[in-house]
């Protein structure tokens, strides 16, 4: 490699800038080089600012023509083109190069004597340099100061205080050479920015202003003295904000220190403030003089005008108005004085010689007033005492006591007037979903209420009473309101507990009043909710030891029930009144109330089926803002046994979750979170398993889930598919596996292959532990093993699906309360149903045989499950790692893993991945929610590794 001298032999000169102020990118490069310098020199990259000027040599035209192309540029030229932001601009003035500041100083006219002075200085420096080169002895600063007898000037910075980080930053921003925004972006694109330093922005936001930055560039190999790696940059606030958003490299922000300062105000004013104050005072004096002059002129004019007006008014009043009004004033004053004189004479006559007082005394004495007042004294005393007593009693009443009303006692025995005269209950049959059977049964009542004459002509007796029974929340009250809303008739609604009061006879009175109101406004509907509080079965008073139960409270309740029985089917049945009762405890009702003639129809309102649940969810979803990507049919099919009230609560809970997560509408994830909160419970924040515990739980749950997917994929099994797996602790559980529910027929007619596949799914948790951990299994899968043991025994004994076919009834070995986390693996509770096939252990040999056959069946299915999971060990381990990383995984993701990790995939392919816990997969509902825009992390390419 050529030396530095070879470079200078090319005519290239280097000069180091002293203190540039701006970054103007101008490069002077040679278009051609001399033909005699063909040696290629690999110079180190110069990162600091430098200036390169290549002088043209004569006789090099031929070589210049060949080097015009970019590929023929020398190394230094290419460095200048690639790193324009690091080259400080230089300007040629004569034969000398100057930076921007030096060129500005030259333009001021001071360079006339500078040339001669610089020439003398260079001569002196060269002479001094030759003298110092000759002397090779060491020179110390103390010796120089000791020998020096002149004045010694020390820079004041030596005695100055240490600058803080913030002050040093401001100084560097001011002194360092400036870099433009375009240069910084070029350096950022080439990854040459080492550090970007800025100062913390204060709490007050400014729309205009500037922010300073210090840019540290990366060093490159080469001469360090020729590199400048530190620059300053000053940008507007908007440009600075845009730059900080765009720049993603290392940053350092200097914290702004807020300190209080207490000091003495200077005795003398600031010269600028003094000049401003004096100018303001002069202007104020001029304005005051102008205002005073204007006031004198305007004041004189106003005074003249006021004097003229007042003079005119005085002359008019004295010489015109007063002569005209004088006769009238004399007349009115004379009449007024005459009236006063006559009145005074009359008053004197009345009050003289006793006057009126003597007449009043005679009337009181001889008119009998005194004797009457003596008789009224005791009467007034009694009245005043009663008034004070009542006033004291009313003042002691509680705050929530009603206003004293004489008719309150009468209204106490009446039923509350809850009739809607127009039948405006606000509910129609269109608002009722999921209980189509009950609605069809009640259509006849609506027809009768709309047209009762048609039934009377045909001689048809409509059903007098209808009992609605069923679990809570299934829509019994809603159906009753829909009947009145469809028919448009008055609707009277009361609860069974409202007929019970502290006073005797109030319940019967309210029954009579309620039916009286309904008969007056017939056709009408009477609805009593929770009728079991009113019509409980009566006690048998003729049985032994039953008199103690027949107390006053029981007698009052039975009296109210008797009145209800009479109103329903007595001598006056009251045609045109439909009676509806609702209860969820039919077994408590009195048999006399349930007989035909009183309750002619008893309609069972059951929980809705899958179609009914879907209709209910659609009705409630129409009242909230729900995303179109939410699949309501999956929730309708996977939530068996849920009533309409619970489905309504699900939608409301999902809306609350969406608000809590600041979503614009209800998403699929919000519905899933709401299902988990209502079934399992909320997330337990304080409970978090360690890594080993999470690995065990994840292995067990993934083993159960992936076994079902493998059986569906390779054996076409008719079992549930996994919906999602979670290891987030909720409620009383540490992990959950949610399955998709099959149709109802699959649970009614279970076949042996289907039950054996379910047995393999239950054994999948323990099998997965053995595949991953070997014989070091844990009790994490004990919940699934208990169900598997009883399922195998029940296949042999009660369901008799294995030979020999012998019924051997026995009760379940343990009682379990199923916790719903999706479609249960115990087949809707039928797993622990003994079908009343329970017998005492008579043949103990049969018990031993059943136990032996159950053990063989479990071992056989367990070995098959272990073999199936060993073939897919890579997919199993990949699913476990993804679950540990994401805490929750969907069934679609499990299918994605099984597609990319087929059976017999080498385990090393998974272990060689950079991040085995990542998965480049987005579920379908998330893709729909994001508008078909999916961002997938391609850090791990599964297709390339499998």
UniProtKB/Swiss-Prot annotation:
This is Probable inactive ATP-dependent zinc metalloprotease FTSHI 1, chloroplastic. It comes from Arabidopsis thaliana (Mouse-ear cress). Keywords: ATP-binding, Chloroplast, Hydrolase, Membrane, Nucleotide-binding, Plastid, Plastid inner membrane, Protease, Transit peptide, Transmembrane, Transmembrane helix. GO terms for biological process: chloroplast fission; chloroplast organization; embryo development ending in seed dormancy; plastid fission; protein import into chloroplast stroma; proteolysis. Disruption phenotype: Embryo defective. It comes from the Eukaryota. Residues 1-54 form a transit peptide. ATP binds at residues 470-477. GO terms for cellular component: chloroplast; chloroplast envelope; chloroplast inner membrane; cytosol; plastid; Ycf2/FtsHi complex. Oligomer. InterPro entries: AAA+_ATPase (IPR003593), AAA_lid_3 (IPR041569), ATPase_AAA_core (IPR003959), P-loop_NTPase (IPR027417), Peptidase_M41 (IPR000642), Peptidase_M41-like (IPR037219). It is found in: Plastid, Chloroplast inner membrane. The keyword Protease applies. In the N-terminal section; belongs to the AAA ATPase family. GO terms for molecular function: ATP binding; ATP hydrolysis activity; ATP-dependent peptidase activity; chloroplast protein-transporting ATPase activity; metalloendopeptidase activity. The chain crosses the membrane at residues 289-309, 320-340, 369-389. Signal peptide: none annotated.
């Amino acid at each position: 490699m050529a030396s530095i001298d070879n470079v200078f032999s090319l005519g290239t000169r280097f000069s180091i800038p002293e203190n540039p102020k701006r970054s103007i990118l101008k490069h002077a490069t040679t278009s051609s080089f001399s033909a005699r310098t063909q040696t290629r020199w690999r110079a180190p990259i110069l990162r600091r600012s430098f200036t390169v000027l290549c002088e043209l040599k004569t006789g090099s035209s031929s070589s210049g023509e060949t080097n015009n192309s970019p590929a023929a540029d020398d190394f230094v030229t290419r460095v200048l083109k690639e790193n324009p932001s690091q080259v400080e601009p230089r300007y040629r003035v004569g034969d000398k190069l100057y930076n921007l500041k030096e060129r500005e100083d030259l333009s001021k006219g001071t360079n006339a004597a500078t040339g001669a002075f610089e020439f003398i200085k260079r001569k002196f420096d060269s002479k001094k340099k030759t003298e110092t080169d000759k002397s090779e002895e060491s020179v110390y600063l103390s010796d120089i100061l000791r020998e020096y007898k002149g004045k010694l000037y020390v820079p004041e910075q030596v005695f100055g205080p240490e600058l803080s980080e913030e002050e040093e930053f401001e100084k560097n921003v001011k002194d360092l050479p400036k870099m433009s925004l375009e240069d910084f972006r070029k350096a950022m694109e080439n990854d040459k920015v080492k550090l970007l330093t800025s100062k913390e922005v204060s709490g007050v936001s400014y729309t205009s202003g500037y922010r300073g930055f210090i840019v540290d560039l990366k060093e490159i190999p080469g001469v360090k003295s020729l590199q400048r790696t530190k620059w300053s940059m000053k940008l507007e606030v908007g440009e600075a904000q845009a730059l900080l958003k765009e720049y993603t490299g290392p940053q350092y922000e200097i914290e702004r220190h807020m300190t209080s300062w207490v000091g003495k105000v200077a005795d003398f004013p600031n010269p600028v403030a003094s000049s401003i104050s004096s100018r303001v005072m002069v202007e104020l004096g001029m304005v005051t003089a102008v205002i005073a002059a204007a006031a004198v002129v305007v004041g004189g004019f106003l005074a003249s005008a006021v004097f003229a007006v007042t003079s005119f008014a005085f002359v008019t009043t004295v010489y015109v108005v007063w002569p005209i009004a004088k006769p009238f004033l004399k007349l009115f004053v004379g009449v007024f004085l005459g009236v006063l004189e006559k009145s005074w004479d009359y008053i004197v006559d009345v009050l003289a010689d006793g006057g009126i007082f003597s007449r009043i005394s005679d009337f009181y004495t001889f008119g009998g007033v005194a004797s009457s007042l003596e008789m009224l004294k005791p009467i007034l005393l009694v009245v005043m005492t009663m008034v004070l007593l009542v006033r004291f009693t009313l003042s002691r009443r509680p705050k929530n006591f009603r206003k004293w009303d004489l008719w309150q006692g009468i209204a106490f025995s009446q039923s509350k007037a809850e009739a809607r005269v127009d039948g405006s209950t606000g509910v129609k049959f269109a608002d009722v979903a999921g209980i189509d059977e009950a609605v069809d049964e009640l259509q006849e009542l609506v027809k009768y209420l709309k047209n009762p004459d048609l039934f009377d002509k045909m001689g048809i007796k409509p059903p007098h009473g209808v009992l609605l029974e069923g679990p809570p929340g299934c829509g019994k009250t809603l159906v009753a309101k829909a009947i009145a809303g469809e028919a448009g008739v008055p609707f009277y609604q009361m609860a069974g507990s409202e007929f019970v009061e502290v006073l005797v006879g109030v319940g019967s009175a309210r029954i009579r009043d309620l039916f009286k109101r309904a008969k007056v406004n017939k056709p009408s509907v009477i609805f009593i909710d929770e009728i079991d509080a009113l019509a409980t079965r009566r006690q048998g008073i003729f049985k032994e030891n039953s008199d103690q139960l027949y107390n006053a409270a029981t007698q009052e309740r039975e009296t109210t029930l008797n009145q209800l029985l009479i109103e329903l089917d007595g001598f006056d049945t009251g045609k045109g009144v439909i009676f509806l009762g609702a209860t969820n405890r039919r077994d408590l009702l009195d048999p006399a109330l349930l007989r035909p003639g009183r309750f002619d129809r008893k309609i069972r309102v059951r929980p809705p089926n899958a179609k009914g649940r879907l209709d209910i969810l659609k009705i409630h979803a129409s009242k909230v803002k729900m995303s179109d990507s939410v699949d309501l049919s999956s929730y309708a099919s996977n939530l068996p046994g849920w009533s309409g009230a619970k489905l309504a609560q699900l939608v409301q809970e999902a809306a609350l979750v969406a608000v809590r997560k600041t979503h614009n509408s209800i998403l699929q994830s919000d519905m899933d979170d709401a299902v988990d909160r209502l079934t399992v419970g909320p997330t337990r924040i304080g409970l978090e398993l360690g890594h080993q515990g999470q690995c065990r739980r994840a292995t067990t749950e993934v083993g159960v889930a992936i076994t079902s997917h493998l059986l569906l994929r390779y054996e076409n099994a008719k079992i549930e598919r996994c919906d999602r797996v979670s290891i987030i602790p909720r409620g009383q559980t540490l992990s959950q596996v949610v399955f998709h529910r099959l149709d109802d027929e699959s649970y009614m007619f279970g076949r042996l292959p289907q039950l054996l596949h379910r047995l393999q799914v239950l054994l999948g948790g323990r099998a997965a532990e053995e595949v991953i951990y070997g014989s070091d299994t844990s009790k994490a899968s004990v919940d699934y093993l208990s169900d598997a043991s009883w399922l195998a025994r029940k296949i042999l004994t009660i369901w008799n699906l294995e030979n020999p076919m012998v019924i051997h009834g026995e009760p379940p070995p343990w009682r379990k309360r199923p916790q719903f986390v999706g479609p249960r693996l115990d087949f809707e509770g039928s797993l622990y149903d003994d079908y009343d096939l329970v017998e005492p252990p008579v043949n103990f040999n049969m018990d031993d045989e059943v136990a032996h056959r159950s053990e063989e069946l479990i071992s056989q299915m367990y070995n098959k499950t272990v073999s199936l999971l060993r073939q897919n060990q890579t997919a199993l381990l990949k699913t476990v790692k993804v679950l540990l990383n994401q805490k929750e995984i969907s069934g679609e993701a499990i299918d994605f893993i099984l597609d990319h990790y087929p059976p017999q995939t080498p385990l090393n392919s998974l272990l060689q991945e950079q991040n085995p816990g990542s998965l480049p997969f987005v579920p379908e509902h998330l893709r729909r929610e994001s508008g078909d825009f999916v961002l997938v992390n391609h850090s791990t390419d599964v297709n390339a590794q499998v």
